[in-house]
Amino acid sequence: SGVMGGKVSHEFMVPAKDGEDVVKVGSENVNAIEVGHIFKLGTKYSAALGANFLDAKGNLKPIIMGCYGIGVSRLISGVIEQNNDQDGIIWPQEIAPYKVMILVLDAGDKKIMDLALSVYQELEKSGIEPLLDDRDERPGVKFKDADLLGIPLQVIVGKNSLKDKTLELKTRRDQQKIIKPKEEILREIKQRING
C-alpha cells in the first residue's frame, strides 16, 4: 500500500473470499488479494540520485527504473484460498512444504515403526523429504491432522501393513486410496513426484 512515483503501475490479484480488494472478474465484482505489483518509475528517482549509465555513444543517461514485488505471504494465502476443502489445505504438489507424509498408526510397535522408518529412509535416498508423524495419538487424530496440513501424498503404516505386507497411499486432493506392497507404493510415489 502507498503511493509510488511513476505513471504506470500494475497489480496482480488472486480472487479470495477474505481479500481486502475488490476486482472485476467477468461481469461480477469479487474480493481479491494483491499478490504482486509492478511500478514503472521512469527516471524520477535515478535522476534525483544521480544513478546514471553510459549509452552506446558514451553519453551519460539516467537509469530507467522499475519496482517489482511479490508478496510471498499473500501469495501463499492466495494459494490456500484456491486449494482447500472442509478438511483443510490441499497443497499443490509444486509448492507443498512436504510432498509425502508418513502416518505411523502405532509408533509404540517396534515392527511398525521400523517399517515406517524404512519408507522414510528410502524416500530420502530418492531425494524426497517426507514428514513423519510418529506421535502417540489415535489414528483418527492423525488422519484429521494430515488432511488439515494438506500434504499431497499420505502413506499409512499400521498393523495391516505388517499383516498384509502392504502400505496404503492416499492422495489428499481426491482422497484416492491405493493399497499395494511397499516397493510398488514407493515406485508410485516417485512417479507422481518426479514424473
Q: Language-model segments: what does each one mean?
A:
Residues 1-195:
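NTP/phosphate- and nucleic-acid-binding module
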